[in-house]
Design a protein with these regions (language model features):
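Short N-terminal binding/cap micro-motifs at the start of the first secondary-structure element
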Residues: 12-15, 146-147, 272
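Beta-strand->loop->alpha-helix junctions that form or flank phosphate-binding loops
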Residues: 30-32, 49-53, 94-101, 139-142, ...
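Conserved beta-strand segments that form the floor/walls of ligand-binding pockets within enzyme
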Residues: 111, 264, 382
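Structural motif
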Residues: 8, 72-75, 225-228, 251, ...
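ATP-dependent carboxylate-amine ligase
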Residues: 1-47, 56-66, 70, 88-91, ...
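A generic structural signal for residues located within well-ordered alpha-helices
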Residues: 120, 269-275, 325
Length: 459
């Protein structure tokens, strides 16, 4: 089977491309720019085209050279030349959520949903099931050291009392209600907060979407939910198909303290993620001794409090790369960093992700950073320009919000040079090279391209 991916450099789409490569399919793909993700896929045998083209697959016009299926990222605009060509030729086209949804029907699927903690919890579950001999297929929105720095692991069916079962662990993203394409046997629901308000408009609509998602569970399905979540008392958690009720986990459980001691990754939020994983394992009757051993061995994942020690101009620094881009994620990451490095100076370099998120959650960003400053979770904060997400920004909102306005608001009550606006990654790197003395912790935070900041330290 020949499959072409439009937007193959995305973290989700690339995982699906890896899956089909492992399955022996002919994979091609395109994106706007090359990246370490596209280069890794090329090394695996995928044919990569940069940028998008009006031709498909190998670029040959002959019918037998055309792909059988085109899978595209939801971020790809409708007028994309490859998509237009595929539809004109009558080639089947599926969005990434639609394509992943088809897989969920073929597997015993465990879907991790929620505003925060999806990638880490999904990764933990994938690792634990692997250690327990369940040989799962895992499609996750980050790269895992345990899976050879890959965002995909392809497993095989295993024989259990019920017969042969194939397990699939996925992230169930709520963006644009993507998760409504998925049909899992187990749903993990971490937390629910206001996010993606450009699509949902308000929290009420977000809650409705999550409730609809839980209705996708079969009669013997299992809903595992966070008892500590402030929105847990909604009707979502009255799931009673065939008399079944949710299984809750909480930081008040006795296991919390043990997990806090054995986890390699810091932060109470990661203890919560581990509790969710432990609850899944117990639902699958995996012994606790295997679960705790697997969780103790978890090394973390790419851009999730990803710690590296580096030297720049003979200055030793600790770099923490983190994907956090929502006020709550920022809060828990800064708090965890201060707990881990109580005596070091902490610099936070934050790149807001998407104008609309920054606009709708502006007050929450201000509240979070003011609290972090008051509690000395950082010593210096640099905010760069907002990462512009192509195809998802409204011009009228772009005119209303900026990083300069965010910094001005943060400095309104007290201007002490602790919070700065520096527009670009390059200028930020140049500033840091000149001012860092060595020994500092530098947190690079955001879902855009801010993770590339260290590349500019040597230029």
């Amino acid at each position: 089977m020949k499959i072409h991916f439009v937007g193959i450099g995305g973290i989700g789409v690339s995982a699906l491309a890896r899956y089909y490569l492992e399955k022996g399919c002919q994979v091609s793909g395109s994106d706007l720019v090359s990246s370490e993700i596209t280069e890794a896929l090329k090394a695996k045998g995928a044919k990569i085209f940069i940028p998008h083209r009006s031709k498909l697959g190998t670029g040959q016009a002959e019918k037998h050279k055309l792909p059988d299926l085109v899978i595209y990222s939801p971020a790809v605009p409708k007028e994309n030349p490859e998509l237009k060509k595929a539809r004109k030729l009558g080639i089947k086209c599926l969005s990434y959520p639609e394509a992943l949804g088809e897989l969920t029907k073929k597997y015993f699927t465990i879907a991790v949903s929620g505003t925060h903690g999806k990638s880490t919890t999904c990764a933990m579950i994938g690792l634990l099931l692997t250690k327990a001999g369940f040989d799962p297929t895992v499609i996750v929105g980050t790269k895992l050291k345990e899976f050879g720095d890959s965002n995909c692991r392809v497993g095989k069916p295993i024989r259990q009392a019920q017969g042969k079962i194939q397990y699939l662990v996925i992230e169930a993203d709520e963006h644009m209600a993507s998760f409504l394409n998925y049909w899992p046997k187990i749903i993990v629901l971490t937390t629910i907060e206001a996010d993606h308000l450009d699509f949902y408009k308000n929290l009420k609509n977000i809650l409705k979407a999550f409730k609809k998602f839980t209705s996708h569970l079969p009669k013997d399905g299992i809903l595992i939910a966070n008892k500590d979540d402030k929105n847990r008392d909604t009707s979502i958690f009255t799931f009673t198909k065939n008399g079944r009720v949710p299984i809750f986990y909480s930081l008040k459980q006795k296991e919390s303290e043990k997990l806090r001691k054995i986890l390699k990754i810091p932060g109470v939020h990661n203890v919560s993620n581990a509790l969710a994983t432990l609850t899944v394992a117990r639902a699958l009757e995996i012994p606790d001794r295997i679960s705790f051993k697997a969780l103790a061995e978890y090394k973390g994942s790419w851009r999730r409090f990803d710690i590296k020690r580096v030297k720049i101009n003979n200055k030793s620094l600790i770099i923490i790369n983190d994907y956090g881009h929502h006020p709550t994620q920022i809060k828990v990451t800064l708090k965890a960093a201060r707990e881990k490095f109580p005596k070091r100076k902490i610099w936070c370099i934050f790149q807001p992700h998407q104008y609309q998120r920054t606009y709708y959650l502006f007050k929450d960003f201000v509240k979070t950073f003011r609290e972090a400053k008051k509690k000395s979770w950082f010593d210096k904060l640099i905010i760069t320009d907002i990462y512009d997400v192509a195809g998802r920004e409204k011009p009228e909102i772009k005119r209303e919000v900026s990083s300069e306005k965010l910094v001005a608001e943060l400095n309104k009550k007290q201007r002490d040079n602790k919070i700065l606006y520096i527009p670009t990654i390059q200028k930020t790197a140049k500033y840091l090279i000149g001012i860092l003395k060595g020994g500092e912790v530098v947190i690079i935070m955001g879902a855009g391209d801010i993770y590339k900041l260290p590349e500019y330290f040597s230029t």
